[in-house]
Amino acid sequence: MRRSRLGACLLVLVVLAGCNVFGGPATPGTPTGTDAAVSGPDAVPGVADGRLADPETLLAAHDGAMLSAGFENDFRANRTVVRNGQVVTIVGRQRTLVAANRTEYRYRVTSGAGAPSSRFDTWGNQSVRVVRGQVGDTVRYSTGPPADANDLTGSGTLGPYLTGSTFEVADSRTSDGRYLVTLVATATNESAVLPANGTDLRNYQARVVVDASGRVLEFEASGNYTVTTGSTTGSGVVDISYRVISLGDREIDRPEWVPTALSA
């Protein structure tokens, strides 16, 4: 089973609107020459008989196609959880830039609203991952092995949502030479998408757009539920949004703090 490295609150990255703080411009993604000739939705990895029959196959294809091409993606999440005995809503965002074949990457994860404000900047390559973490006024550095694929592509967080629902094909089309399939959730196992202490999922909707290579280009999920801790009951919300901003190789700038972190 895939598990998100970001945890239940999905910590997130903040980027100033219209400002790319991570690296150089991306090389625009080029649709594959076979997209226009795709025979139907069942040609998409993991899709069969008009539904998402094998989410793990789709996610594996997503990881491979995204990492080989290079990309920029954006992940946002609001989730209500129990923290320190209180019902709180965590707001997070992560934005990630990855060079082709994962030779270098950067991402920033921030969280706030119901949690101590924090920011984690990560730079890495095929040998090492370096993190600068700031919680309040405290700054710490750490190093470790390269980031896992699902930390970069988002598949670790998408996994429970895709495996926890039945998705059926709602639409297929070709746009700018790229074959796209839209699937929507028609039934959901609430235990797969709710946090601990969450019950009674309602008004839940989920939608995913994939291309012929299996890349998840868009994912949206939202709903309400009840959160209980001790004698306290509150209203919970889940609101997840993922999108691929661009595909293609790019230059990744190495942050000036990396030497400090490597020597710490």
Please report, for each region that a protein language model flagged, where it lies by residue:
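Acidic- and glycine-rich mobile interface elements
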Residues: 192-194
